[in-house]
Amino acid sequence: MSGSRSTLPAADLARVVVFAAFIAVLGLFPGFGGVAGVPIVLQNVGPILAGAILGWKLGTASVALLLALTAIGLPLLSGGRGGLAPFVGPSAGFLIGWLLSALVTGLIVQRARTRTLPVLLVACLAGLLADYLIGMPVLGLVVGDLWSGFVQSLVFVPGDLIKVVLAAVIATLVHRALPDLLPTPAREPRVR
């Protein structure tokens, strides 16, 4: 009996689960400082790495799995946070932004003809900006002033830029070691 239901191959499912677990492990490193109840954490590099290594579809799926498990109560976020509270507090926009972060990073990496450090730096930076695109305005709404939310979010930028470089280096090494991990777009012939 064949249906129209598509299935995820076992290897892809394993990659999604392992990366969701990896992002959860990054949450074991305690957050510190931050602004308006949003801590500075290592965990936000996980979605960027997921997109950079697994591509947009599997990377986004791994983040969605982590967020779903968190929402049902597992304490998978930095500081042992879980349940619905993180999704309605000051971190909410950044958490939801993780989905967009993995998606944007993964799309750029998958569409790139090469997976060199400069390409991966651009992809990872774009993923970070995608997270900020959602996180900063939501933080602004929580603190009661969009501009204030933007300014307060600037405290995250230096550390996040270091994490972006680290993610790009790791992803470059992974793609160098496993060049067929993601399909590469076909090169179009040059017209002379």
Q: Where do the protein language model's features map onto the residues?
A:
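Short helix-perturbing small/polar motifs within transmembrane alpha-helices
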Residues: 16, 25, 84-131
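Interfacial aromatic-anchored transmembrane helix boundaries in multi-pass membrane proteins
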Residues: 27-39, 67-101
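Alpha-helical transmembrane segments of multipass membrane proteins
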Residues: 23, 27, 62, 70, ...
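Membrane-embedded alpha-helical hairpins and interfacial helices in multi-pass inner-membrane proteins
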Residues: 36, 80, 112-192
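Glycine-rich, small/polar surface segments that engage phosphate groups of diverse ligands
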Residues: 53-75
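Structural signal for the C-terminal ends of transmembrane alpha-helices
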Residues: 53-57, 104-112, 173-178
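Hydrophobic transmembrane alpha-helices
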Residues: 1-60
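Hydrophobic alpha-helical transmembrane segments
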Residues: 13-18, 45-49, 59-65, 91-96, ...
